[in-house]
Amino acid sequence: MPTAEPARKPLMSGNWKMHHNHLEAIQVVQKLSYALNAADYDAVDVSVHPPFTDLRSIQTVLDADRIPISLGAQHCHWEDKGAFTGEVAPTMLAKLAVAYVIVGHSERRELFAETDDWVNRKVKAVLNARMTPIMCVGETLPEREAGQAEAKVDGQLRAGLAGLAAAQVSGMVVAYEPIWAIGTGQTATPDDAQAMCAAVRAVVADLYDRGTADATRIQYGGSVKPGNAADLMAQDDIDGALVGGASLDPDEFARIVRYRLTE
């Protein structure tokens, strides 16, 4: 008798980047919570990833009001302590009840020269601190036009997951973000996004096994908006969205979280 594939609960993550001070952040989270209900949280996991300076304020609000939104961070170092001016340790984030940490976002790779090796170290550090990494992969427009999109993502995945056990990978999140679509208003078509997310799952299956690949959640990111969320989420291998600009507005982000109501 065939075994049903494990259900992958969608994860909608709002990456606020360098936006919202702590007072604005409190208002956004409260407004977002007013727009969502128990049925939404049953259907979808939700995380918000504010700047470091907002984390404590948001954690206090989430705890006090018992809001079932997970707290996330945008970045961390791989060491627990040391002479790393300006950096934040994963263990420090864990003490603030951070659940998810974005690792290897293209802006970190491009603007701050983060390498695949650094990404791998951070993924391991986040896991060791008992948080869930959201590891980002994606290609540039020239790489896509040259037919190298899958090869680029393949390399990032193999390097980023190096040394990890299957059980660790099955519990983490991979976010496929075509770099050319981030903040540009351009979006990969649902078919293109599905093809790349399926390719991500195939690499995980090749590195580990089909069960691990089927359990791993894969997000799509890149100009996700209320108008395209449902079409993207209808794809077999897309298990959520890593949302940038649209997550800054609580009403817009709520509409994305509630994509199933617009299908």
What are these regions (language model features)?
Residues 1-263:
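Active-site loop-to-helix "anion-binding N-cap" substructures in soluble metabolic enzymes
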